[in-house]
Design a protein with these regions (language model features):
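Gly/Trp-centered helix-boundary motif
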Residues: 1-136, 140-141, 148, 223, ...
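Hydrophobic alpha-helical transmembrane segments in multi-pass membrane proteins
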Residues: 47-53, 119-135, 161-173, 236-257, ...
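Generic hydrophobic transmembrane alpha-helix motif, especially the helices
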Residues: 99, 103, 109, 130-137, ...
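Short hydrophobic alpha-helical segments within the ABC transporter permease transmembrane module
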Residues: 112-114, 156, 203, 207, ...
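Glycine-rich helix-loop "coupling/hinge" segments at transmembrane-helix boundaries
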Residues: 161, 172-176, 191, 207, ...
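Alpha-helical transmembrane segments
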Residues: 192, 196, 200, 249, ...
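Transmembrane helix boundary and interhelical loop/hinge segments in multi-pass membrane proteins
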Residues: 205-215, 313-320
Length: 325
């Protein structure tokens, strides 16, 4: 039997892809998206430099405290104990023994800034994590449910937005610590309560946009439960936004903790944070400006680096940037 040449020239239809092939294709697309984002981030010189400086600050805060415990590393272990008091070394100035000078009690600032950085950065990341958890839960439920529920949840957020950030954080801190003893976790919870609104609103907007996509409607059409749609189709696609949100929320939390500690409402001594070190240095900043300048410089550098990193991540993960690149 003769075969029509035109019929023979038509492409043969490929068999429909299996579920495994669908999953493999999705994994490849997701991998290429993150690879493309990484390439774009590495091309952003400002964001790359900010990331390097950010890592250096974190390593300094993590590694320097361990050196006090190793004999022979420093000239004197006592000199580099952040809580060791030696009035004969009060405001000793810059030297090899005290690279960042000393405070009024003769405590080495090189060690104290490192330990204070541990506390400030730990509070920043812990509060940011809690902010994102609350924001994801609240925002995703509000955006997915929609209707009157969404409207009511957003009006509640609007009411909270009307509260000034720092006074709200101060009041929350005082409520959680009526005795006046403020711990690290008290500070984390206080800053979380005062800061989670923006994350919730961002996640809500992303979920509202994503839930109109065909793959979400298809999942609903086949009877997928709401929590499965959220967990499998919506929340994974907000990952890029959440990564950016980490470095957008971190500066505000670090500044909030520094402000509360600077005005005497932060973590109780002898626990040091960058804000409390700056508070100690304000008494003699006219004669010894380095005691106030160094912790403030550490705060400003970390905040600027986090902002540059967030900008770089936003540019790298923005689909419109990828399309025009």
């Amino acid at each position: 039997m003769a075969v029509d040449r035109r019929e023979a020239a038509l492409p043969v239809a490929a068999p429909p892809p299996t579920t495994t092939e669908h999953a493999a294709g999705a994994a490849i697309r997701q991998s290429s998206l993150w690879q493309d984002a990484w390439r774009r981030y590495m091309q952003n010189k400002a964001a790359l430099a900010a990331a390097v400086i950010f890592v250096i600050i974190c390593l300094y805060c993590l590694l320097v405290p361990g050196f006090w415990k190793i004999p022979g590393i420093w000239t004197s272990l006592k000199d580099y104990d952040p809580n060791a008091v030696d009035f004969s070394q009060s405001y000793a100035g810059f030297s090899l023994d005290h690279p960042f000078s000393t405070d009024k009690f003769g405590r080495d600032l090189f060690a104290r800034v490192a330990v204070g950085g541990q506390i400030s950065i730990a509070i920043g990341f812990a509060a940011t994590f809690m902010i994102l958890v609350i924001g994801v839960v609240y925002g995703s439920l509000s955006g997915f449910i929609g209707g009157k529920v969404d409207n009511g949840m957003m009006r509640f957020l609007d009411a909270l937005y009307g509260l000034p950030y720092l006074p709200f954080a101060i009041i929350t801190t005082q409520i959680l610590s009526p005795s006046g003893s403020v711990s690290v976790w008290t500070m984390v919870v206080s800053l979380t309560i005062a800061s989670w609104f923006t994350a919730a609103r961002v996640v809500r907007g992303q979920v509202i946009t994503l839930k109109e996509n065909d793959y979400v409607r298809a999942a609903k059409a086949v009877g997928a439960r709401w929590y499965r749609v959220l967990a499998r189709h919506l929340l994974p696609n907000t990952l890029g936004i959440l990564v950016i949100a980490i470095f957008l929320e971190l500066p505000g939390v670090v500044l909030g903790e520094a402000f509360l500690s600077f005005i005497g409402l932060g973590i109780n001594p002898p626990t040091a944070s960058w804000g409390s070190i700056a508070q100690d240095g304000r008494e003699a900043y006219r004669l010894h400006p380095e005691v106030l300048f160094i912790p403030c410089l550490a705060i400003a550098t970390l905040v600027l680096c986090a902002n540059f990193i967030a900008d770089g991540l936003r540019d790298a993960l923005d689909p419109r940037t990828r399309e025009t690149g």
